[in-house]
Amino acid sequence: MKEFPKNYNFTENEKKWQQIWQEKQIYAYDPNISKDEIYVVDTPPPTVSGQLHIGHVYSYTQTDFIVRFQRMMGKNIFYPMGFDDNGLPTERLVEKQKQIKAYNMSRSEFIKICEEVVASEEEKFRSLFNQIALSVDWSLEYQTISPLSRKISQMSFLDLVKKGEVYRNDQPILWDPVDGTALAQADIDDKEKTSFMNYITFEIEEDDRPFSKFAYREEFVGNTEHSTAAYIKVREDASTGLTHKLPLEVEFGKRSITIATTRPELLPACVAVFYHPDDKRYKHLAGKSAITPLFNGKVPLLADPLVQQDKGTGLVMCCTFGDQTDITWWKTHNLPLKTIVTKKGTIDFPHDIAIDGLKIKEARTKIIDILKEQNLLTKQEEITHTVKCAERSGAPLEILTVPQWFVKTISHKEALLKRASELNWHPKNMKIRLESWINSISWDWCISRQRYFGVPFPVWYSKRVGEEGKILYADISQLPVDPLKDLPIGYSKEEVEPDLDVMDTWATSSVSPQLSTHGISDDFTVNKERHDKLFPMELRPQAHEIIRTWAFYTILKAHLHQNTLPWKNIMVSGWCLAEDRSKMSKSKGNVLVPEKLLEQYGSDVIRYWSANSKLGADTAYSEDVMKNGKRLVNKLWNAAKFVSIHFEKLKDKDKQAKLLDVKEKITNEFDQWMINKLVELVKLATNELQNYEYANAMHLTEKFFWAIFCDNYLEISKNRAYDEENKNPSGQYSSILTLYHTMQILLKLFAPFMPHITEELYQILYSDKSVHEKGNWVNYGDLNYKIDAKGAEGLLEILDIVRKFKAEKNLSIKAPIKLLEVSGIELSAELTEDLKNVTSAEEIQFEDQGDKIKVNVIL
């Protein structure tokens, strides 16, 4: 045993151990060990899009609890760290940090700046991850923009092309006008926004018959009647059956209808007006045409069951495109395409109504003003409705028709639901989120982005005569390729047009397992032996808000590539909230910076706070929990320091032996009860960790440490451990062995959660080897002392009564007692002696009265 330092300095010790762990490669993966001994983790590659916050620490440390446990259980851990350092999130960081815009410079110049920024940011990430003691093997690090990752990502694309699961199409897609790129369904947020429902008058194509422009469903019975003064609408009284004729003010020779819309700026793109086929108000419109106000476009009046009869007037204009229903109608009814919105979110429609070049909101305001001037806007209603916005920029999305690459998704929904059920979910209720997302999918996955810093498509388009537009794919031997610099085999630069788009960043991070295993499928692999050994993986840890993206896309890719799941287990963490349980945000000023907390409390305390939250639960940051963690670190130090003074009395061979091998030397009844409780704790904590319930394991261990070990066992066994008069040598040795092995086992149980303090104490007290080494979990065999636990538990109950008595009398805990009269139980001689010592009682008398323990204290 080493000399015990006077105090524990967490700042110095945490830095010391972090450096030693790296130097000694404590966390290194061994590629030579068999597959069945490997535990492979698909670590979340943090997006290089800004500063890491306490929420990252919260989720990453929870993964590390499980990884450290599995390593100590004897698993060969494959625990990489990646960086998702390409795509729109990274571009936005670079533009903000450098105060530049990608479209104002050359592509190559912008990419170079991106590479410089991500290199700097990733170094900050590494530093923080080391400070919070993530036990990753840094030799397995990857970047999603590296040449190898680009190669594997392009392999994924080509494999899906070969399998017929990828296609290119000129079809309506979601478009972010701020970032100037197509987006996938998973990249959007539904936001509640205030707007106006505008009731606009459309004319019906002129003819001879008059028509009531006001007809409501509850009032309409049949055709309206002629009148030289006014039109008549007919209403039937349901209670009497009588028909009432009501005069209306109308214009002769013209018929009109009213539609309600939130997007009047799309009037030039109107291609039809729809009503529900069961709506009696509008059945007479079948086969007719309407004239769009201001722009005089003739559009058909059509029936479709998707119309909501009770929304607005029950008449809906179909524009190309305002929403997904417009797309459905456009396809179903073979309607023409009128595109008036540009990629920059402006109107492209030269007309007497001067809206050309205006932004969407500006055009909307101008159209409404003109409609009012011409009495074509009958009313406006303020409403709150859901608007689809870009997750990153926050901009309301447009729907444009731009050629894009898609992965077939809708056709696989049933198979993906089955995959979700095959996966082991921790916690189980998170599966519902994936199932709900899969059921809601209505678009194939658009994987192309009109950006710059990303993985390029290995694609060119032929300009050769006779095959113009033919898609040319790179050969696997060419990967990774940049179509702007490289050429397809057999073609010259003049004969091809490169694909300028880059892949959705999720298209690369969705193969994060394969970025580590170095393979995609049997046909596309960099290292087949490595891939087959590591894939499918054991664990995917991630946060719940990216179930619809990262989890879903990774499952989809593995299903399409190899007809399998990418991992066996998924553990889903919750959010870290502010102390008032509100969401952390920069605008609120309540974002916690990990570096400041590390300086104040140290890594072990922060990890303790993280371990106090159940998996999947959203948890508020708590200063009280942090203080409890600091108190626990100090108590571990002091308890270890206290018990260490006795260890020199043990024989060296007994120090080196396993607990099972010295069980015969633990002879005292209370010591044996203590070891039995310890073995029970190990079984429970091990089971909880095997089921990813780290919080339960931490709670059980902490409760045992405070309540059983510190508050009771240390006090009860203290006299025997000292035994200054050498009255009970076997009892003394028994207690010291119990202290020795209990402290050692507790350090191992705490090690996954608080790695620094446990390493420091373990190496002072027990070994030069790391407590975190592979296979160093508790091995107790079939250890179990055949004793009646009622005796030791009775001792504790009596002690509790005596402590309360002394507290009520304001007496010192060491205050002497002349006599304890105890009824309801009789203790053995060994337990009686321990009870006398801990209560400072001169004498204890047992009386056989009843089953309930009662104690009479005589001072």
UniProtKB/Swiss-Prot annotation:
Motif ('KMSKS' region): 583-587
Binding site for ATP: 586
Keywords carried by this UniProt record: Aminoacyl-tRNA synthetase, ATP-binding, Cytoplasm, Ligase, Nucleotide-binding, Protein biosynthesis
GO cellular component terms, semicolon-separated: cytosol
Record-linked PROSITE patterns: AA_TRNA_LIGASE_I
Motif 'HIGH' region positions after renumbering to this chain: 46-56
Enzyme Commission number, as recorded: 6.1.1.9
Gene Ontology annotations of biological process type: valyl-tRNA aminoacylation
Record's catalysed reaction(s): tRNA(Val) + L-valine + ATP = L-valyl-tRNA(Val) + AMP + diphosphate
Example of a GO MF term: aminoacyl-tRNA deacylase activity
Subcellular location(s) per record: Cytoplasm
Purpose of the protein: Catalyzes the attachment of valine to tRNA(Val). As ValRS can inadvertently accommodate and process structurally similar amino acids such as threonine, to avoid such errors, it has a 'posttransfer' editing activity that hydrolyzes mischarged Thr-tRNA(Val) in a tRNA-dependent manner.
Family, similarity comment: Belongs to the class-I aminoacyl-tRNA synthetase family. ValS type 2 subfamily.
Entry note about domains: ValRS has two distinct active sites: one for aminoacylation and one for editing. The misactivated threonine is translocated from the active site to the editing site.
Assembly, per entry: Monomer.
Name of the protein this chain belongs to: Valine--tRNA ligase
Species whose genome carries this gene: Rickettsia felis (strain ATCC VR-1525 / URRWXCal2) (Rickettsia azadi)
Gene that encodes the chain: valS
